Amino acid sequence: MNSLMNDDMVKIIRNGLSASQHPKHILVIGAGLSGLVSASLLKNAGHRVTILEASGRAGGRVCTLRSPFSDDLYFNAGPMRIPNNHSLTLEYIKKFKLPTNVFINRTPMDIIYANGIKTRLQVFERAPGILRYPVAPNEQGKTSEELMLSLLQPILNFINQNPARNWRIVEEQYKNHSLSSFLNTYFSYGAIDMIGVLLDMEAYMGMSLVEVLRESIFFSSPAHFYEITGGMDLLPHAFLPQLKTNILYHQKMMKMSQGENRVTIHCQHQQTAEFTSFTADLAIVTIPFSTLRFVKVEPYHSFSYYKRRAIRELNYISATKIGIEFKSRFWEKAGQHGGKSITDLPIRFSYYPSRNIGANGHAVILASYTWADEALIWDSLSEGERIQYTLLNLSEIYGDIVWSEFVSGTSFSWSQYPYSAGGFTAFEPGQELELYPYIPVPEGRVHFAGEHASLTHAWMQGAIESGIRVAYEVNRLP
């Protein structure tokens, strides 16, 4: 595999790939961000591309909901923030001249409501005992973040000394550790509970420690975050002027057949139920492995044992978001300007608008953001019940004003969405070494991209990075 450095990828975004000496017809499965990136680069390099998309829109998990909200209001059901070190995402935003604003990820006034006690982040940071977690004597007086970093920072410092070499050492050393098994070695149950609740790590307890280390590089450094003003879906939409004639919507891949010189994708139209076959020189599969499991691959041995195992075992985390529109920004009167509230109630994390702080009129908050098992409990409820329970939880923080100010709401569960069958990839212990090496590797005439085919899971950066990598790979073929 040709390894591209980050700077190489930035240059490819700016200047494109070299013009192909051997133009091909390429089928791209999925019009998510990685599919759009690879198709855009390959089309510009002289290839003929056809994008087959099962849903009725482009963007995949980059999804912004504008209904049922009032004019110009929306919430991002998928990605909602961009760390300032995600250079590939920011480079595409610059290329398309998309407007951005700062995403306020946390403030000292963030409300914490846990163990029946309501306080502010700045108060908790001065006196962590205020929340009455039953921590051990040697853990008293330390915040959840301080406890977590006391363990992770030495490992992160070691990685940063020589990332190319030291990541491998860390992967090998901690390959069998989940976050939970690692924390259990050092901390009391009370401290682990506090870390899980306040740092949103409960969902990651069963995940690979190495996965958490990759994530913590973003959150331990005081990263700034941005959002695309007007909705994150403006990024995938920016590819459409170039690619709209290349996308066929409602075409769901049911079967894939490889020959010596060609690959055929058999699709069923999601509205008419009609079957159509598309044949080309190569295919790039960008859909999640959770959905690829349902696709018949012929001949059977055209995919290696290791690829099939990765498709079967790769772990996906559920994610559910609930957005609520209110008549006014009553949370700002309570001192919450952007940032988030954290609670051990079912809603868990609420994020408040970073834009137009102090403005009058309606606004939408991301009233609940949950992952993994915490998202699954919401999946058991109807849309109406989700909104009802969200308002009940918010009223425990803000009082009855939430009922009088309520306008409308909507929710989105990525596990219940048939074209993703989960929110994002998160390795279980061992998967980084056992499965990942086989995920991005081509199988005959079939190549692979998507956030799961990168090591930057759950971020647009991972999808973009894999889209560039696969386009570069395909463009170099004879």
From Swiss-Prot:
Classification via Gene3D superfamilies: 3.90.660.10, FAD/NAD(P)-binding domain, Guanine Nucleotide Dissociation Inhibitor, domain 1
Its GO biological process annotations read:
amino acid catabolic process
Q: Name one GO molecular function term.
A: L-amino-acid oxidase activity
Q: Which cofactor does it need?
A: FAD
Membrane-spanning ranges: none
- The UniProt annotation places FAD binding at S34, E53, R61, M80, R81, E451, M460, Q461, G462, A463
Give the family, as the similarity comment puts it: Belongs to the flavin monoamine oxidase family. FIG1 subfamily.
Name of the protein in its database record = Putative L-amino-acid oxidase YobN
Q: Which gene encodes it?
A: yobN
